[in-house]
Structure formats: structure tokens, C-alpha cells
Amino acid sequence: MGRPSKRIREIAKSLDAAKAYTIREAIDILKKCPPVKFDQTVEVSLKLGVDPRRSDQSVRGTVSLPNGTGKTMKILVFAKGDKVKEALEAGADYAGHDELLEKVNGGWTDFDAVVATPDMMREVGKLGKVLGPRGLMPTPKAGTVTTDIAKAIQELKAGKIEFKLDRHGVINNGVGKVSFESNKLEENIRAFLIAIQRAKPASAKGHYMRSLAISSTMGPGLKIDLRESDLAAKES
């Protein structure tokens, strides 16, 4: 890991490294950090008390953030016939089959989400080396393999995101922009935590949510006191 930038080191001097903040306190600190030339993403990093090596302790799902992500989503749809027209009319940025399959296979990834009709998955599945590492492979569980193309596009445009446990037992996701009002960011973060709580595997024992940190793209990472939130502290 590289050395923190001078900017981060200066910000860190004003923070108590031992303190666990409330969600609202952390948001307010990030918003008061010196501005940069772009609207930073607010990111959540959550360590879970599960074993990522066990298939019965996988944590994965989706959540519709109540205030969106603040990001303009570029959506690619793999479909044929009338579904291509339906996709474009619903707001897809790209829609089609053979030409797009070939383009993605060549390494093109100028999009943020992929939706596919079930009949396209045999071909889309062959793009695993390109889509998989970027978390872009459509799945039925995420609602991105569907015949209801319009609904899937509308949900993604409105702020539906997918979360997935990594090999270290951590979930990392963007949940909004620094420019959002504090209460809207807090609503998004709490909706995100509720979704992860509901996705708790039945086989998971002990404390489920182990630690939580909130950061911005160019800002510090702030430890959150999970006890201040009933939903995060509660063990079911």
C-alpha cells in the first residue's frame, strides 16, 4: 500500500484516530474536507463475520438507494428483436447482440451495468473474463437477467446497486456523492446496511457486522460506531 497523500495526512491531523464516529458525524467531516475538482463518491467498507470460503456464507444482493447514487449510469443491454427497441426506449445507452458481444469481447467496457435477456446468456456467459472481474456480469439474482428489460433499466438508473462479499470478508460500495445533503447520504447508508443485514446467511454465527468505515474518494477513512445504529448492532 502506498503512502497516504499530503492532503490526506493534513486532514488526518485534525481527526482522532481512536474515535468511532456516528454516521452523521462521519458524513459531516467528509463534507468539510478541502474540496477537490470533482464530486467525490462516498464509499462504505463493511467487514462481516462470515467465512468467504464457505458457499453457505456468501453475502450478495441488491439495494435501491432511496436517493440514488449521484452517478449517471451507462447501461448496456444484450437483447434481440423487439427487446432492443424496448431497451433503448427505456433509457439504455447501448442495446443489441452480435456487434456488442464482439466489442466487449475485445475489451470494451465503457458502461456501468449490463442487462441481458435470458436467451442471450449463453453468449454473454462467454464474456466472463471481461465482465466478471469488473462485477458487470448480469445475474438473475441481481435482476439483470430478465425479460422485463424496461424495469431493470429504470431501477438501475434510479439507484439500484449490487453488493457482494469479497475474498477478505469485506463489502465495499459507493453510496452517493459528497454533494448530497447529509440526511440523504445517511438515508442511503442506512438503507445499504439494512439490505446487508437482511442478507445475513443462516449459517453465520456470532457478530455479523464487525466493523464499518466511511470514506470519500480523496478523503480519509472514518471508523463508525456500529452501536449507535440499532440496525447494525442488532444480531438476528
UniProtKB/Swiss-Prot annotation:
Q: Which GO terms describe its cellular component?
A: large ribosomal subunit
**PROSITE patterns of this UniProt entry?**
RIBOSOMAL_L1
Keywords (alphabetical) are: Repressor, Ribonucleoprotein, Ribosomal protein, RNA-binding, rRNA-binding, Translation regulation, tRNA-binding
Q: Which Pfam families match?
A: Ribosomal_L1
Asked if the record carries the keyword rRNA-binding, the reply is yes
Subunit info here reads: Part of the 50S ribosomal subunit.
- Task performed by this protein: Binds directly to 23S rRNA. The L1 stalk is quite mobile in the ribosome, and is involved in E site tRNA release.
According to UniProt, the name of this protein is Large ribosomal subunit protein uL1
Q: From what organism does this protein derive?
A: Protochlamydia amoebophila (strain UWE25)
Q: Give me the gene this protein comes from.
A: rplA
